[in-house]
Amino acid sequence: MKGKETMSKQNEKLVVGKLGSSYGIRGWLKVFSYTDNPESIFDYSPWYIDQKGEWVEYKVEGWKRHNKGWVVKLQGLDVREDAHLLTNFEIAIDPASLPELSEDEFYWRELFGMQVVTTNGYDLGVVTDMMETGSNDVLVVKANLKDAFGQKERLIPFLEEQVIKVVDRQAQRIEVDWDPAF
């Protein structure tokens, strides 16, 4: 099995899917995409596969639809046995390969770690996760240890103008119109 150019896992990568079991005898693998449009995972190249704490670069040689999913051929994997060794490994990409967004659009990963404060200056905590609910995205905010309202976590809808007043990338801060007791 030949991987290209290894790099330390600490280099930021964005996980976009997972490799499944091997398919056929020529080194193909099933792919499970985490992207909104599953086929868009193939828009990004190279892919990085986590191998023992290192990101190993692989180029996508080919891909095709198979039943209700996808299969992929990675460069350097030519036999089933080599492909089998990558079963259940995560697929990541370089975040720099993502399309640039307008000033008022955000990737979820940009919001993680941002401080959340009310319009009155009350510190609600830090964004630790995001949830997709269908109608709108929701910020998962871990409250400060000494939260005056005894909250450990808050779920705040990401509704621009209504709830989200300002997202300041520079200051790593989100200002919200939200009742701290809720």
UniProtKB/Swiss-Prot annotation:
Domain of life assignment: Bacteria
UniProt domain PRC barrel: residue ranges: 103-182
SUPFAM superfamilies in alphabetical order: PRC-barrel domain (SSF50346), Translation proteins (SSF50447)
First and last residue of the signal peptide: none
GO molecular function, one term: ribosome binding
Keyword set, alphabetical order: Chaperone, Cytoplasm, Ribosome biogenesis, rRNA processing
Subcellular location(s) per record: Cytoplasm
Name of a matching Pfam family: RimM
Any GO BP: maturation of SSU-rRNA
GO cellular component: cytosol; ribosome
PANTHER family named among the record's database cross-references: RIBOSOME MATURATION FACTOR RIMM (PTHR33692:SF1)
Summary of subunit composition and partner proteins: Binds ribosomal protein uS19.
Similarity section: Belongs to the RimM family.
Protein task: An accessory protein needed during the final step in the assembly of 30S ribosomal subunit, possibly for assembly of the head region. Essential for efficient processing of 16S rRNA. May be needed both before and after RbfA during the maturation of 16S rRNA. It has affinity for free ribosomal 30S subunits but not for 70S ribosomes.
Domain text: The PRC barrel domain binds ribosomal protein uS19.
The protein's name in its UniProt record: Ribosome maturation factor RimM
Gene name tied to this protein: rimM
